């Protein structure tokens, strides 16, 4: 009877957390879909330029994700322990860090957009469109970090549904404004890439306003001004111990992952366009593993923080098994969606052929992505075991994938699909190493004081 009750609780918790988080991630990914299809419907170069320009926000998110991951790891454990004072302190610390990061990226994008675009492409037309986008979108980068902190607090405090609702409303507003500003409507002239940037900015303002408003409802954690200017040395040290390795891993992974777009950008506009569409489809399908990963981190973290180490370990083992099933489902979704996307997207014949080949590579990539995301980000992260991600990425991505892609792009003139496959090999090659580390159970740890 005890086993049945345990299974029921596990499944109920998993679905309660996974579905709203997956919906939230899906809604966020749909913004990229809207940008790609609406801009791509006007001009392939619009789509490619925005895809490259948003790599700047991707880099910003590496820093923000380190702060919010520290908030999620410690927050989930202290919520399990029901220590609200510690939660307030951690929340304020994350807000301070995200605020500094947001200002730095705003300045870079607002005042030096052309230099940033030159990192990703040498095509003048893509650079010009990207600069137009960044000059407006840079203002939204001021707000993103604050919103993410509020969203994470909702997730770990049993309000994942509210977080999903906020994201859904924001995305719907973004998509509607995209249609109005990109194409032109209600007396507004077509703004193409500038319209996409303006829609993003307005939706970010709405997202932050909704997040702050919900935080004042009973049962929610809100930012307390006095905590914003106070400092708990012990919690700050714990936060840095969790976030430091995550930031290192984010930089190792994020800079490497961004370089993948650089390789495609330097292989011509057709390759860049195919990569833009493939990235959008990949991100949508990966919402499934991201949802399970986030749910795993919260569920296991709650148990570990409450002192239930045995149950937390059992949850982790089940999540590891689930990661393979999730990967198989994602592979099927990739294979099924490929012909549908190819039918609707507007590309040159060469870009369409490239895209077909990239989809084939991604079908195999999904297994590795699922296993590593759920086990490393979810299970390992729940107990503060955050170092593995950084050094495994340093070896598989920077030691194998990137050197191969650099050689193929700049020296050996390999076909686009071969270079793209090189950028995906790290996720597959890392699986055995991840499973060996999992069996050491270093992640079964109570981090609370």
State where each predicted segment sits.
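Residue-level hotspots within pore-lining transmembrane alpha-helices
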Residues: 27, 31, 60-64, 104, ...
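Helix-terminus/linker motif at the lipid-water interface of multi-pass membrane proteins
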Residues: 26, 30-48, 117-124, 180-191, ...
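Transmembrane alpha-helix boundary and packing residues in multipass membrane permease domains
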Residues: 21, 25, 36-37, 54, ...
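Short alpha-helical transmembrane segments in multi-pass integral membrane proteins
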Residues: 1-21, 75-142, 188-244, 300-366, ...
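Small-residue-rich hydrophobic transmembrane alpha-helices
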Residues: 47-110, 144-163, 261, 274-338, ...
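Transmembrane helical elements of multi-pass membrane transporters/channels
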Residues: 16-35, 136, 170, 203-207, ...
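Short runs within selected transmembrane alpha-helices of multi-pass transporters and secretion channels
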Residues: 68, 137-156, 163-174, 196-212, ...
């Amino acid at each position: 009877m005890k086993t049945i009750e345990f299974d029921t609780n596990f499944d109920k918790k998993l679905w309660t957390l996974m579905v709203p988080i997956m919906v939230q991630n899906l809604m966020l990914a749909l913004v990229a879909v809207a940008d790609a299809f609406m801009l791509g419907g006007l001009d392939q170069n619009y789509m490619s330029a925005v895809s490259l320009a948003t790599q700047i926000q991707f880099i910003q998110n590496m820093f923000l994700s380190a702060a919010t991951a520290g908030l999620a790891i410690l927050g989930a454990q202290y919520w399990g322990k029901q220590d609200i004072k510690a939660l307030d302190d951690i929340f304020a610390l994350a807000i301070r860090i995200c605020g500094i990061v947001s200002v730095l990226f705003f300045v870079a994008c607002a005042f030096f957009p052309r230099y940033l675009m030159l990192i990703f492409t040498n095509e003048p037309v893509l650079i010009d469109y990207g600069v137009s986008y960044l000059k407006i979108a840079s203002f939204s980068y001021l707000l993103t970090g604050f919103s993410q902190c509020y969203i994470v607090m909702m997730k770990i405090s049993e309000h994942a549904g509210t977080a999903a609702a906020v994201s859904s409303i924001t995305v719907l507003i973004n998509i509607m404004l995209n249609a109005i500003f990109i194409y032109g409507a209600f007396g507004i002239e077509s703004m193409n890439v500038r319209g996409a940037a303006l829609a993003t900015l307005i939706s970010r303002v709405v997202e932050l306003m909704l997040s702050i408003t919900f935080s004042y409802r009973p049962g929610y954690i809100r930012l307390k001004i006095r905590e914003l200017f106070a400092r708990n040395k012990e919690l700050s040290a714990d936060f840095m111990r969790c976030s430091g390795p995550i930031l290192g891993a984010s930089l190792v992974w994020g800079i490497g992952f961004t370089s993948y777009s650089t390789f495609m950008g330097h292989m011509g506009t057709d390759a860049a366009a195919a990569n833009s569409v493939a990235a959008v489809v990949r991100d949508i399908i990966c919402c499934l593993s991201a949802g399970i990963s986030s749910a795993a981190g919260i569920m296991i973290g709650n148990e570990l923080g409450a002192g239930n180490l045995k149950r937390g370990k059992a949850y982790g083992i089940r999540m590891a098994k689930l990661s393979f099933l999730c990967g198989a489902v994602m592979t099927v979704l990739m294979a099924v969606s490929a012909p549908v996307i190819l039918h609707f997207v507007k590309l040159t014949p060469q870009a369409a052929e490239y895209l077909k080949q990239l989809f084939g590579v991604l079908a195999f990539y999904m297994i590795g992505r699922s296993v590593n995301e759920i086990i490393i980000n979810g299970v390992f992260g729940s107990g503060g075991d955050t170092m593995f991600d950084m050094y495994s990425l340093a070896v598989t991505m920077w030691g194998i994938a990137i050197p191969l892609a650099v050689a193929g792009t700049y020296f050996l003139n390999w076909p686009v699909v071969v270079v793209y496959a090189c950028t995906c090999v790290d996720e597959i090659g890392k699986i055995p190493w991840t499973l060996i580390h999992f069996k050491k159970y270093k992640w079964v740890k109570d981090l609370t004081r």
